[in-house]
Amino acid sequence: MEQEKTTMNQNGELEGKTRVSMEGVPETMLQTLYARAAETEKEKPAIRDEKAVEIVKRLDYDFSLAKKDAAMGNGVIARTIVLDKLVGNYLNEHSNAVVVNIACGMDTRCYRNEGHYKRWYNLDLPETMEVRQRFLKEDGVISQIAASAMDAD
């Protein structure tokens, strides 16, 4: 995936990019995002995830580890294909479904299935949702919940 040429601002951030603090957030959520974006930009992609491409272009983040890990990238794409098919099939049969995507990270499946569900809830840890909310402004039928699925409350 090509990186845009940009300049640094006074804060040491790339102009036009958003730097995210990964403190307390699993970096794998950005690596999986990058894998989907990189696949989408191939000449003959196995999946299409325009939201991932849009977010990666806005991020000031070093994706060199994700670029080197072909096995991880291929696994992400295989998992995306399988889960998109399973979710799509279910939603085709249950158009009034309410979906809860637990440990969503930067998953964008809700956008790839827009119009095929009644409501969609993306749930993850507060630290993760803080990053997600900077790039995905979800409202209407898509909601974000910052909580642990392990909490009893």
Q: What are these model-predicted stretches?
A:
Residues 150-153:
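Short loop/turn elements that flank and shape the SAM/SAH-binding pocket of Class I
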Residues 2-100, 104-147:
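Rossmann-like AdoMet
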